[in-house]
Amino acid sequence: GWGFDAAGFDAAVDVDPAAGLRLRLTLDAAGQFDITQAALPESRSEWRLARAGVPLLSTDPWLTVKSTNRAAYDSARTALPEGIDEVVFVNERGELCDGSITTLFFDRGQGMRTPPLSSGLLPGVLRAELGCPEEVLLAQDLPHVRLWVGNALRGLIGAVWVG
């Protein structure tokens, strides 16, 4: 692991937990950290989802760790079409993965599920908190499932697939 000055971090962070801010800690291999904070944007009660234009490779190890190596996600987020709140990535096998800033959840009528880590996605905090069973979701399944997206900052948000 990397060394980290926890006391220095505690001294550098002066945030009211009730403020509803996004706090981001970036740590490098030398143990140096950078802290940024920003207000969370207002969120709708239902997000409109579309497919990301670039497929992911499920074996890419960078998909399984929270890092700054996220060019595909950032590009897709920057290029969101009008009326779309989130894009969902598909891997080389046609399996749905993550959104650009969210985890995908779905229900076929048997309880909430989430795509398996083997599809190539981040084991996010919300995903761990909800403890949903994993199940492969293909694009052709989308008209037949109830959808949600979410993350640790925004919680679980109802979603509709618009393509």
Predicted features along the sequence, with ranges:
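Helix-start/capping segments and mature chain N-termini
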Residues: 1-22, 26-163
